[in-house]
């Protein structure tokens, strides 16, 4: 009877707790994907555009600062 009680305890208490813990992690992972834009359908390539600062004078192919 003791062996049957241990087996029932494992399958009726411990096993469901382990599976519930795994299911609880899934929404957090989905939220992390949305925050980090890991979804390939919504991913947009962002290329930074260099901005010129201050007064510059063009010399050939180079913009050099004045002063």
From Swiss-Prot:
Signal peptide residue numbers: 1-24
Molecular function GO terms recorded: ion channel inhibitor activity; toxin activity
GO CC, one annotated term: extracellular region
Isoleucine amide sites (modified residues): 66
Chief location: secreted
Protein's job: The homodimer-1 (C-62 linked to C-64) causes a reversible hyperactivity (jumping, rapid circling and tail flicking), when intraventricularly injected into the brains of mice. Monomer and homodimer-2 have no activity.
Family (UniProt): Belongs to the conotoxin M superfamily.
The protein, known as: Conopeptide Vt3.1
Naturally occurring in which organism (per UniProt): Conus planorbis (Planorbis cone)
């Amino acid at each position: 009877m003791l062996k049957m009680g241990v087996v029932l305890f494992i399958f009726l208490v411990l096993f469901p707790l382990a599976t519930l813990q795994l299911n609880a992690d899934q929404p957090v992972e989905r939220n992390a994907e949305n925050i980090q834009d890991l979804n390939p359908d919504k991913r947009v390539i962002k290329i930074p555009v260099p901005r010129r600062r201050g007064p510059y004078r063009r010399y050939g192919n180079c913009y050099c600062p004045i002063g």
